[in-house]
């Protein structure tokens, strides 16, 4: 999903590329939602051994409906088209990522590790929880929506209590405002 939203030092490679000897036992799943800014369209695809893909087709055909023909055509155009817009988006995501990472680390109790792609940060807020007397990341997240008017997702929703997820898929101006609100609400 984030194949092109990446700015790490090493080039992105799939598992099949990393372990060619496992190619015939590898299933690669991808989609256009994130890299092509088509979130909500639910267009995905996969590649792998034909017997496994055949089984997946049987399950999929009975459990989900088809994407609209317009969405399918748009996905094909995106996959076959220029990546120039993606590169421009990635530059903007990187700027927002770097700002948000640094700004959160300036807030007492936040510990944010820089990422190499996507458009989320997942800071460790265990010190904030302890210092401010919150029960857990869920209570902190509820507090931030109520007091700072900033929506975050508790890390426990992803199996990582003590963390929160923040998206930077918005303008830098809104990110700065959100950071100020978070900081002010915790002072």
In which residue ranges do the predicted regions lie?
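PLP-dependent class I/II
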Residues: 1-187
